[in-house]
Amino acid sequence: MPKVKALQCALALEIRSVTCPGVLLKDKEDIYLSICVFGQYKKTQCVPATFPLVFNARMVFEKVFPEAVDPGDVVAQLEYDTAVFELIQLVPPVGETLSTYDENTRDFMFPGPNQISGHHDSNRQVTMRRISGLRGIAPKLEFSTTSVITECLISSRKCRTQDKFTYHSAPVEKPHGRLQCRTSRSQKKKSKSPERSKYCINTKNYEQPTISSKSHSPSPYTKRRMCELSEDTRRRLAHLNLGPYEFKKETDKPPFVIRHVDPPSPRADNFFGSPGRDCERDGWVRMHSDHPHLGCCRAKDYKVIRSPHGRDFEDPFERCEDYLSPRTCSKPQHSARTLLVHSAPSTTPKHCASPVLNRASLRERFHSDWCSPPNCDEIHDRVKDVLKSHQAHGRHLCEERDPEKEDELELKRSLLYRDSAYDSDPEYSSFQRPRGSFHLDDGECWSNRAASCKGKSHRPVFENSMDKMYRNLYQKACSSVSHTQESF
């Protein structure tokens, strides 16, 4: 491969300590310092959480600029890069950033005269910015840098892959504190060896796991939270394969899965499922024909859901709409609701695809309980018991009453019942009414012929008779009270 000339910028960074006098950390986990220069992430060893934090770490950052012609072009390109320092404590689950410091890479590598004192590689002190979990004064970072721009020979392939890969070098320990420059001869040997060239281009350093992520197993909630972190933190935690998370509402999910939907059919088998339900279907038809209060209920087209086992199931939501839909009359609606409350669930197969399909349909529960002969007999027996209890209670009250007053009340009750029945039915003509005469309280006889001749209906005659009767009762009661007082 042909060799081309390029400029290589190397930065030797020596981190000494982080000081913050008078500050105590509430958490006791270890702390490390993360550095990002030239897009390369490196970190120091962990130290105890007690200020001052003494690191004494040395690391080297290198980057090749194949398009640069002179060092001025390299310095100009360094203006678009940022050097970032992060002081991170290993607080579960993903660590907590205590303070940060960022500066333009050009100013960081080549500081001005006001930032250094004495030699170029002397110590520097910068104030970091507090973020969270740190109270008091801001911490101060002590470090020193050595920057070198050299000319090197690289292959054209490396020039094309410079933007895709990053060249890393392990921290080199030098006894005299000087940066060891690689010669072109050593680079030529490395380029010839395929094994060494494979290790020259390593994976990106930010793809390597952090110390905190190695020591803790993230939970599902932590994974979702880590997806919302900054871009730099997401790069450091890329080995976890968190992936993009899209939070959806629960309403977007369907209530149940419909396996197969058949077109509606007018046949009765589609309404009631398999032919094994013929008895239940006949009972349902009898209910519609025998009970007039359910006349407004009509059968509708239902969607049939086919299970993997071949059995048809009715859509439960269609059945609910059929029973709970508003009706023209109020009585059927009340009866339907009453039947829904007192219905008992029937047995269904347990191999349905959805738990909703395991429930018995409202129609099955409706007519399976009310059309069976034992239930009908039980209902009739209960009604008879209630009627007998009311008759016994009425008979007991009649025994306590006066026989004469009871005869009068019975006569008036019969007149009231017949007259109300005639008046409530406008189609009931006078020719259809039974012929007969009625005796009033004063011995007068009132018949249908007398009503037609005098032009008075039974209602006003009944009201007049009731007035007379209550007036006589009142007079008798007053006379009995006065007679009792005189006797005393």
Swiss-Prot record:
Keywords: Cell projection, Cilium, Developmental protein, Differentiation, Flagellum, Isopeptide bond, Phosphoprotein, Secreted, Signal, Spermatogenesis, Ubl conjugation. One of its GO terms (cellular component) is motile cilium. Residues 1-17 form the signal peptide. The modification Phosphoserine is found at S217, S219, S265, S274, S325, S343, S346, S354, S424, S465, S487. Required for formation of the sperm connecting piece during spermiogenesis. Sperm connecting piece is essential for linking the developing flagellum to the head during late spermiogenesis. May be involved in myosin-based microfilament transport through interaction with myosin subunits. Belongs to the SPATA6 family. GO terms for biological process: cell differentiation; motile cilium assembly; spermatogenesis. InterPro entries: SPATA6_fam, SPATA6_N. Testis-specific, in spermatocytes. This is Spermatogenesis-associated protein 6. One of its GO terms (molecular function) is myosin light chain binding. It is found in: Secreted; Cell projection, Cilium, Flagellum. Residues 175-225 are annotated as: Disordered. It comes from the Eukaryota. Interacts with MYL6. There is a cross-link at K248 (Glycyl lysine isopeptide (Lys-Gly) (interchain with G-Cter in SUMO2)). It holds the Pfam family SPATA6. Residues 200-220 have a biased composition (Polar residues).
